Amino acid sequence: MTDKSKESGSGKLLYCSFCGKSQHEVRKLIAGPSVYICDECVDLCNDIIREEIKDVLPKRESEALPTPREIRAHLDDYVIGQDHAKKVLAVAVYNHYKRLRNGDTTSDGVELGKSNILLIGPTGSGKTLLAETLARFLDVPFTMADATTLTEAGYVGEDVENIIQKLLQKCDYDVAKAERGIVYIDEIDKISRKAENPSITRDVSGEGVQQALLKLVEGTIASVPPQGGRKHPQQEFLQVDTSKILFICGGAFAGLDKVIEQRVATGTGIGFGAEVRSKDESKTVGELFTQVEPEDLVKYGLIPEFIGRLPVTASLTELDEEALIQILCQPKNALTKQYAALFELEGADLEFREDALKAIAKKAMERKTGARGLRSILEGVLLETMYELPSMDDVSKVVIDESVINGESEPLLIYTNSDSQAAGAE
């Protein structure tokens, strides 16, 4: 390499060691040990690396796609119950990614449409967890959006395009990667229109959002500003094809059960002609959700065009006490395993007796928050122990039973030293 630095007036004139341009011909010259590189060469190197990565991506695409049975088996490791919803999700996700791999048309020229998913189920039944677990298993970008924060374009709040913005952020603005992603829109029931008939006044956070979501969910070329900003209008917008993105919408749909019950009731008479049902005969919310029809969702407040964009509907049932006990200890990342791992870092074992698990599940049932309420119950029960344990010596085991859950006694501490144990018992 020839020495391209020479004296010029007050100092040396520096040259790029790669392309030979002087410091006056480029915007920036970065110095290393006896070498220099200009900003243009850095950009060129980045382009070369990007091309290399693109060559690697098709190899990944050629890997075998997990079958619906394999997807369902993975969901079983993390989500308890909801067998029908898992089966529906596994088939829908498999078909979606099979369509992406083989193109939108078959060899016969048949166009394959996109099937987005609507999850209906009570709070804490596992809607969000199912979507997260799916994305993690398939190793695709995943983002969550809250429908309650969305408004029509031009109003205070988030535009629907912000959803794609978040997805791009998750994959460092790699458009090709983002187009294979999954978007989960939570609280979709909260954007139902306020009345069954179209309103004269604008409903910017209800029907207006549904209208704005239509093209995005169905498939359109969304223009997203690079690196998130409208501060630089001269920047070129990124073009993202949303027809390749899988949209999963979820909501609790409180009150939908009454709409379904009204439709399925066989007795339409009034007075003596009306059908009388006992409390035992009345169906649970979960059972009613399995009978949901598009007309029920329209009556609830979703516009027909939006329901048409979500052809796959999966209903989740309420979790009973037995299912909550299983959630506490069976999944790979079960709560009892998580807290046991935390205690293990302090050098102590954590044991939950069978009656304690039942008491926790019973409390969660009373709160009507599903599996989401389990963590808050455990946090409250273990607070004092987690506060004191780091300052204590010789504690080898902490035992939790029903009386601890009910607030009648303190957790049992077992010490490695028998003298300390005797002192603790006193």
Swiss-Prot record:
GO process annotations (BP): cell division; proteolysis involved in protein catabolic process
Residues in ClpX-type ZB domain copies: 4-57
Coiled coil: none
Positions that bind ATP: P122, T123, G124, S125, G126, K127, T128, L129
InterPro entries: AAA+_ATPase (IPR003593), ATP-dep_Clp_protease_ClpX (IPR050052), ATPase_AAA_core (IPR003959), Clp_ATPase_C (IPR019489), Clp_protease_ATP-bd_su_ClpX (IPR004487), ClpX_bact (IPR046425), P-loop_NTPase (IPR027417), Znf_CppX_C4 (IPR010603)
Keywords from the named record: ATP-binding, Chaperone, Metal-binding, Nucleotide-binding, Zinc
A Pfam entry, by short name: ClpB_D2-small
Presence of keyword Mitochondrion: no
GO CC annotation terms, alphabetical: HslUV protease complex
Binding residues for Zn(2+): C16, C19, C38, C41
GO molecular function terms listed in the Swiss-Prot or TrEMBL record: ATP binding; ATP hydrolysis activity; ATP-dependent protein folding chaperone; protein dimerization activity; unfolded protein binding; zinc ion binding
Record note on quaternary structure: Component of the ClpX-ClpP complex. Forms a hexameric ring that, in the presence of ATP, binds to fourteen ClpP subunits assembled into a disk-like structure with a central cavity, resembling the structure of eukaryotic proteasomes.
Family the entry assigns: Belongs to the ClpX chaperone family.
Function: ATP-dependent specificity component of the Clp protease. It directs the protease to specific substrates. Can perform chaperone functions in the absence of ClpP.
Protein name: ATP-dependent Clp protease ATP-binding subunit ClpX
Organism field: Vibrio vulnificus (strain YJ016)
